[in-house]
A protein has these predicted regions:
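Short coil/turn segments at secondary-structure boundaries
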Residues: 15, 115-119, 226-231
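Single conserved hydrophobic/aromatic residue that forms the stacking wall/gate
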Residues: 1-16
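Acidic, glycine-enriched catalytic cores built around paired aspartates
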Residues: 193-261
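Acidic-residue sensor for enzyme active/binding pockets
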Residues: 2, 6, 21, 156, ...
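Active-site capping/gating regions of soluble enzymes
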Residues: 30-201
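Active-site acidic/histidine clusters and adjacent loop/turn architecture
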Residues: 14-38
Length: 261
């Protein structure tokens, strides 16, 4: 299907509570990034005209699934998907895809300041049981993992949220895939569903402050984005984190206002 704005979409459905789920048809990374930016702007404008509000806030409500932006990806060469074996019917990925997957997992922690770019982003990972992963792992059609083989020849990265900058996330994903292929990084076996796997890779930072430091001190990130962009992005995010740390929240008032030690 195509919209009037030439944004190809595969399907749309009502997700949980007041959330909606839209799947874009796969395309080149740059075009998909353009379409995501355009689509979010369209949503805001249409909501304004209808007198309602749309939010892409990653975690607006506790106990309910947040707003994710799962990135489904594959690599193609000469019109063929390098992540799938032609004619093979069972759920699978190729050795090429395994190495690319290894790169995604290897660099997941360093990329979190982009995948989850706000203070609120990390509330998705702390609210257990909502299919937002908090470990660096993968699985075959396992929605609890940070990377899921959702179909033969396709990887689904579940870490990014709906406020993500797709140009930055796509740049880091491409760099991670490239490094995985170049080094032949082994992602290890997929754990059984519902069973925590071994910690083969650096753990995810679970606050924006930790994520920014991992990002800013990563030689790999600097190689992917360049020093100028890395430093500028880190400066903005450190400021955001500092302002949050200096704010007094409703939770603190409820917890400590009447506290008598």
């Amino acid at each position: 299907q195509k919209t009037a704005y030439e944004i190809p979409k595969r399907d749309w459905s009502s997700d949980v509570c007041s959330s909606d789920l839209l799947n874009f048809m796969y395309d080149r990374a740059d075009l998909t990034a353009d379409r995501l930016i355009t689509y979010r702007q369209i949503c805001v404008q249409v909501a304004r005209e209808l007198g309602i509000e749309v939010t892409f806030m990653p975690k607006p409500t506790v106990g309910i699934m947040g707003n994710g932006c799962h990135h489904n990806l594959s690599l193609w060469k000469d019109g063929a998907n390098a992540f799938a074996d032609p004619g093979r019917r069972e759920l699978h990925i190729t050795d090429t895809a395994m190495a690319a997957l290894g790169g995604l997992l290897e660099h997941a922690a360093e990329s979190m300041a982009v995948y989850a770019s706000t203070v609120n982003s990390y509330k998705r990972y702390w609210d257990a049981g909502q299919f937002a992963p908090s470990r660096v792992d993968w699985g075959l059609d396992d929605r609890s993992r940070s990377v899921r083989v959702s179909a033969s020849g396709r990887l689904e990265l579940k870490l990014p949220d709906s406020i993500v900058n797709p140009y930055l996330s796509h740049a880091l994903i491409a760099a991670a895939l490239e490094d995985g292929l170049a080094r032949g990084i082994d992602p290890g076996p997929a754990p059984e569903p519902g069973v925590p796997g071994p910690e083969r890779f650096a753990p995810l930072p679970l606050t924006l402050g930790d994520a920014v430091e991992r990002f800013a001190t990563s030689a790999w990130v600097r190689g992917a984005l360049g020093d100028d962009l890395t430093d500028l992005y880190a400066e903005f995010k450190r400021d955001e984190w500092a302002r949050f740390c200096g704010a007094v929240t409703d939770w603190e008032m409820t917890m400590y206002r009447s506290w008598v030690p």
